Amino acid sequence: RLPNGICCNGRQIRTIDMVQFGDEIVLTDCEVPSTLAPSAAAVPVLGETDSYIVYNKPAGMPVHPSQGHHGDTLGNVFAAQFPQLPFRPVYRLDSDTSGICLIAKSAYAAGQLQGSTRKTYLALVCGELSTGGTVDAPIGRAEGSVLCRCVRPEGKPAVTHYTPLRSDGTYTLLSLRLETGRTHQIRVHMAYLGYPLAGDRLYGTSSE
């Protein structure tokens, strides 16, 4: 609760208090500065307004700081550009996934943008897939691992829709849409079907 965060006619009130027509409402806009270490890494900016900025995140860059990644994330890049703002990604992408990341510049913008996007992914999988489909299989943490996920009955609901775009018989390019956002969801679901992502050392085979 901020001092004088919401005032009605000069008097501080709560969000649950009633107001009347004609009351003067004043909101204090107080953003907490970023606590992330700034990074000078160059990440392409696809667009920017007063409310948000859109980055083209490269593969290999985490969105959030985590164990082993304290200064090389998209959050650190944002902190270098906007040290006075907290880092508010509207959604996240896995570290190994490249693509568009939308970052809100205020709590209000984050609320307005939440759920307003529809993401489509492209993935190259091993094997030939001629028809599309849907994988509706729960995903949970693999036994004894802090990193790997797998399909397991007690996992969280996860739904992936996939459509083949092109295949040379050895690999297939897929367009995918997710109804949920579980960690490694595309990688886990495609490996579960028997079509792991090409080059995926975690869920593919050693020869891929």
Could you say what each language-model-derived stretch is?
Residues 1-208:
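RNA pseudouridine synthases
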